[in-house]
């Protein structure tokens, strides 16, 4: 991404240059055209590429945005007001959120968390201040706390389940990814309960991984198939570690998104010991 603001800030503040959305769009369109005009000469000088070949490569101005959140390389979100010549801040809209590489697009982020992250991101890019966003996060955390434990897990896809299961039988105890262990725990508990109705987890299946509190079996997590429509009573009665899952899927995801702002959201949105 590129911003001309650091170069032009002094002129704008001194009133020697107009700075508006239209000015920005025209400026960046002009920059893109100048890059295209100068590129063949650059290719010729740097790589001895014939000018007619260097002229085959054309760059286009993609997005102009008025606000942005830049976390790391290839992880950012902006409020786009123009994408490839199409204005988006029309008919009462402030623009369109364009996000890349963020948790709200990751498959291991629960759908309800994706929607919440998008909500607070939209608020931020619309100019909402810290206090209002903090209050919304706290409100959501109270709502999320009221959900049953199995709705607080993290989505995963289980691969090589058969391989790790056979290795476990052969060695007695085998090292494996945590979500695979959680899937095997579901299958084991299903057999222990004599449950022939619930789905068995097999290779390649999508599951939800839930953390567990200390228990006689020594398990730290258990998974269930996302396609299982009727969770059995034995599963719903397990000692889910709600606080651990809430910290992972709410606090962790919010920090990944907004931590770059240094707002100390962990302390500001703590809902424990409030009374």
Protein language model annotation of sequence segments:
Residues 1-275:
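DNA-dependent DNA polymerase catalytic subunits
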